[in-house]
Structure formats: C-alpha cells, structure tokens
C-alpha cells in the first residue's frame, strides 16, 4: 500500500512482531499509523516513544472500525475472528494477517528504488515467498550479486 494521504491514519491492531512488520511496511509506504493492543513489543515501543506512531494500550473496539477506513489485524486467528465481528457493518476495510482469505486487502513487500515504490504481493497467501522475491528483485535492481 502506498499512502497518498497522511491525514488519515491506518489502524494496526496487534502489538507483536507481525504488528511491527506491518507497521514498518505502512510507514515505508508513507502512511500514518495508529496502533491498538494490550501490549507492544520493544520495537513498537521505540516507534511510539519517538512519536513515529500513535498508540492506545487496550483492546480493539467497534468504534475503532467506525473511525478508521483501513485496518490491519496482526492477530492470531481467534482474535482476528473476534475483531471481524466488531467490524461487521462498518465501512472499514481490513487486512487479516493470520486469515488472509477473510480480509479485503493485503500489504505488499515493498521498497523504494529511486523515484519509484516497488512492491511484491501474493495477495496474502504467501508473505514469506513475497519477501524472498522482494529480496531477489531488489538485489537485481541494485546490481548486487545473487547467491545461488
């Protein structure tokens, strides 16, 4: 996702390593991020302390889905299902990291190359494969030798 507007933050629900990776991906794409979680990993705490993202230390609520147009659910499957029930009937589009088939969109593995934003996506079905392909293409574009 490449954000063209920074005045409308994207909600990330989940404060663990997946939430951190998705937050970094959104920040790299120019998005403004608001985090909601009962706890945050050290890397997210650092982003919060630096004022790079805003955060609320609590569980997700229906009002969050009414307030945000886009949300990333970086949660285990059961918590994702519970969050989707809260979201029902709102206009919020969601990316479901643990259950991609239930989401409305998926984030691309992305990077900057000159004036371009380049992204690779499996549509949420194989994030590890997308990350690996990103590394290969990025190395090629940057003229690095590839290991075989």
What does each model-identified segment do?
Residues 46-66, 74:
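Glycine-rich, highly charged phosphate/nucleotide-binding loops
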Residues 21, 29-47:
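NAD(P)-binding Rossmann-fold cofactor-contacting core
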Residues 1-24, 37, 129, 148:
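Glycine-rich adenosine-cofactor-binding loop
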Residues 16-18, 78, 124:
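Residue-level detector of alpha-helix initiation sites
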């Amino acid at each position: 996702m490449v954000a063209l507007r920074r005045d409308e933050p994207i909600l990330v629900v989940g404060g663990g390593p997946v939430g951190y990776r998705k937050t970094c991906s959104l920040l790299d794409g120019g998005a403004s991020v608001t985090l909601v979680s009962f706890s945050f990993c050290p890397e997210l705490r650092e982003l919060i302390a630096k004022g790079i993202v805003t955060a609320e230390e609590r569980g997700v609520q229906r009002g969050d889905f009414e307030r945000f147009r886009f949300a990333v659910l970086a949660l285990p499957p059961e918590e994702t299902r519970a969050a989707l029930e809260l979201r029902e009937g709102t206009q919020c589009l969601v990316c479901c990291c643990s259950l991609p088939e239930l989401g409305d969109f998926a984030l691309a593995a992305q990077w900057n190359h000159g004036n371009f934003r380049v992204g690779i996506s499996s549509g949420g079905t194989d994030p590890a494969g997308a990350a690996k392909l990103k590394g290969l293409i990025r190395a090629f574009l940057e003229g690095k030798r590839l290991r075989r």
